[in-house]
């Protein structure tokens, strides 16, 4: 999903497009570029009118590089520099759950409480951590990667997580996989 905001962070327009990640990581990048351009053009603007682009992505983000975003077929992708080059606009990239937690903390909760945890269930299972009023990134920038914690060392392994990880059990993808397995095995 792409959104166009004014300087006071008011949403002016949004545009939704499927990533088509099953076609590969380069296709995902092409679709992000397309979404940004079409959203801007639909508003009668040019990319030169845009001050900056913010991008939230799954996986660990270190200095504009995305690591372990396996559902997008990205590992060690320099997404920030790729998008800057293709869109000719400053680009800022961070983990999607970090940004969501930070947004809730700063905008919805007006900076209170000083400490909080956001947990987000979707294709994966991620989160963000606010400590002393600031986003806490932790070791290797992975403080909110809750989905990678091992819950059941004998559990299922998925294509995008470790065996028995929280994500393999409790993400939308994991829940569907477990339900499908139970139905196929005749469990009630």
Can you describe what each PLM-predicted range is?
Residues 44-47, 188:
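Short helix/loop segment immediately N-terminal to the Walker
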Residues 3-16, 23-27, 86, 92-94, ...:
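Glycine/GP-enriched mid-protein hinge/lid loop-to-helix segment characteristic of carbohydrate kinases
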Residues 56-57, 70, 121, 171:
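A secondary-structure boundary/capping signal
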Residues 2-3, 65:
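Short, glycine/acidic-enriched capping/hinge loops at junctions between secondary-structure elements
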Residues 11-13, 59-62:
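Short, basic/glycine-rich phosphate-binding loops at helix/coil junctions
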Residues 21, 25-37, 41, 48-53, ...:
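Glycine-rich phosphate-binding loop and adjoining helix at the ATP-binding site
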């Amino acid at each position: 999903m792409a959104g166009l905001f004014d300087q006071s962070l008011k949403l002016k327009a949004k545009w939704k497009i499927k990533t088509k990640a099953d076609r590969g990581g380069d296709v995902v990048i092409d679709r992000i570029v397309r979404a940004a351009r079409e959203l801007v053009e639909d508003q009668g603007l040019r990319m030169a009118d845009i001050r900056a682009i913010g991008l939230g992505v799954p996986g660990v983000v270190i200095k504009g590089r995305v690591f372990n975003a396996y559902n997008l077929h990205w590992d060690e992708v320099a997404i920030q520099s790729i998008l800057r080059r293709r869109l000719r606009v400053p680009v800022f990239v961070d983990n999607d759950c970090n940004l969501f937690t930070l947004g809730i903390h700063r905008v919805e909760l007006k900076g209170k409480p000083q400490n909080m945890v956001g947990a987000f269930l979707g294709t994966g299972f991620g989160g963000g951590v606010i400590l002393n009023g600031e986003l806490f990134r932790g070791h290797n920038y992975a403080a909110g990667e809750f989905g990678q914690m091992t819950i059941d060392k004998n559990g299922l392994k998925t294509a995008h997580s470790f065996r028995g990880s929280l994500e393999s059990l409790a993400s939308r993808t994991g829940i569907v996989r477990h339900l499908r397995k139970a139905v196929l095995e005749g469990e009630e």
